[in-house]
Curated annotation (Swiss-Prot):
Catalytic EC class: ligase
One annotated Gene Ontology cellular component of this protein: succinate-CoA ligase complex
Protein name: Succinate--CoA ligase [ADP-forming] subunit beta
PANTHER family: SUCCINATE--COA LIGASE [GDP-FORMING] SUBUNIT BETA, MITOCHONDRIAL (PTHR11815:SF10), SUCCINYL-COA SYNTHETASE BETA CHAIN (PTHR11815)
Quaternary structure annotation from Swiss-Prot or TrEMBL: Heterotetramer of two alpha and two beta subunits.
GO MF, any single term: succinate-CoA ligase (ADP-forming) activity
Lineage: Bacteria, Pseudomonadati, Thermodesulfobacteriota, Desulfobacteria, Desulfobacterales
InterPro entries: ATP-grasp, ATP-grasp_succ-CoA_synth-type, ATP_grasp_subdomain_1, Succ-CoA_synthase_bsu_CS, SUCC_ACL_C, Succ_CoA_ligase-like_bsu, Succinyl-CoA_synth-like
Task performed by this protein: Succinyl-CoA synthetase functions in the citric acid cycle (TCA), coupling the hydrolysis of succinyl-CoA to the synthesis of either ATP or GTP and thus represents the only step of substrate-level phosphorylation in the TCA. The beta subunit provides nucleotide specificity of the enzyme and binds the substrate succinate, while the binding sites for coenzyme A and phosphate are found in the alpha subunit.
Keyword list, A-Z: ATP-binding, Ligase, Magnesium, Metal-binding, Nucleotide-binding, Tricarboxylic acid cycle
């Protein structure tokens, strides 16, 4: 789960991490009042959406007086902000963060991530802050500093000092940096984060350390332990079909293609998307109905796929184990009758009760095409959508 910058900064402050003074606002009038409360200029008006690259897209601007705050807030609120993370359709801006301007001496990059390869938490930082860190890592990997932390041991002073020295921080900034890292690590572990990122982390003119930006992702599987974190969820920032799928415990991710697919098992779903692309088509979604799905879940999954107007054909790829083929077939038939099947469907089924499943589909009278194997299924659905 993602949250907004202003929400992440609230959490940072709770763990003693310095952040600029600021206030979230939802209208131009509120933005003006927030700027007046801050008192000093310049102030920064920042679009709040769940995506990076807001500055390059025109979603972060500096205001030198109240009139500029009013003008900038009016321009950003309601705009369709397009960044490299939103896709070409962009994301509508419905809220802003108005915060104090700072005397910035240096911009740094800081993050805490989970390294699954080593089963460790990694503190990652760089002197190349305020930039696209992916580009920095690709072009100048030597600028990326990585400090692995054993989660059983936790972050220690030497971890923090190692990062501070390699960042070439001035002596006066090292102690506040260590305190900040310890607070961020504790928050990362306490709240089950999967990613914590500050870009930029700034060194001020008086050698202070302040989190100028904030990005946090939480492990969805651990949210049941954090009712307070769940309250930060902003459904307006999420894909509506993904929100709908989550109500039925379906693992659904919308994509940009035109071949809808329904699969049981995440690995099989990814392999199915790969073979769809190899056949010359593009998947419209990832949908894992799970091994223990029932007819109702299958029906809901099918309905969600059909709700995507980009879908021109559907590939159903099921290996019947816990989810029997006859259960899947019944769910597909019920969903198609309720929603109205208006696109061709290719079905590849193997496993438990496969013959019964094929019989149910064959007698349904629906626009269905059978396939012998996955390669055959992908080729048929690719031909349909071309």
């Amino acid at each position: 789960m993602k949250i907004h910058e202003y929400q992440a900064k609230e959490l940072f402050a709770n763990y003693g991490v310095p952040v600029p003074k600021g206030k979230p606002v939802f209208s131009v009038d509120e933005a003006v009042e927030a700027a007046k409360e801050l008192g000093d200029f310049p102030v920064v008006v920042k679009a709040q959406i769940h995506a990076g690259g807001r500055g390059k897209g025109g979603g972060v601007k500096l205001a030198q007086n109240i009139d500029e705050v009013k003008t900038i807030a009016g321009e950003i609120l309601g705009m369709q902000l397009v960044t490299h993370q939103t896709g070409p359709e962009g994301q509508k801006v419905q809220k802003l963060l108005v915060e104090q301007g700072l005397d910035i001496a240096k911009e740094l990059y800081f993050s805490i991530i989970v390294d699954r390869a080593t089963a460790k938490i990694v503190i990652m930082c760089s002197e190349a802050g305020g930039m696209d860190i992916e580009e920095v890592a690709a072009s100048t990997p030597e600028k990326i500093i990585k400090v692995p932390v054993d989660p059983l041991l936790g972050v220690q002073g030497y971890h923090c000092r190692q990062a501070a020295y390699r960042l070439n921080l001035p002596p006066a900034a090292i102690k506040p940096f260590i305190k900040m890292v310890q607070g961020l690590y504790k928050m990362f572990m306490d709240t089950d984060c999967s990613l914590l990122e500050i870009n930029p982390l700034v060194l001020t003119g008086d050698d202070g350390i302040i989190a100028l930006d904030a990005k946090i992702n939480f492990d969805d599987s651990a949210l049941y332990r954090h009712k307070d974190i769940q309250e930060y969820r902003d459904l307006d920032e999420e894909e509506p079909l993904e929100v709908e799928a989550s109500k039925f415990n379906l693992n659904y991710i919308k994509m940009d293609g035109n071949v809808g697919n329904m699969v049981n098992g995440a690995g099989l779903a990814m392999a199915t998307m790969d073979i769809i692309k190899q056949a010359g088509a593009e998947p419209a979604n990832f949908l894992d109905v799970g091994g223990g799905a029932n007819a109702e879940q299958v029906e809901n999954g099918f309905r969600i796929i059909l709700s995507d107007k980009n879908v021109k054909g559907i590939l159903i790829n099921i290996f019947g184990g816990i989810l029997r083929c006859d259960v899947l077939a019944s769910g597909v038939v019920e969903a198609a009758k309720k929603v109205g099947l208006n696109v061709p469907v290719v079905v590849r089924m193997e496993g438990t009760n496969v013959e019964e499943g094929r019989r149910i589909l064959a007698e349904s009278g629906l626009n269905l095409t059978g396939a012998e194997d996955l390669k055959d299924a992908a080729a048929k659905v690719a031909q349909i959508v071309q």
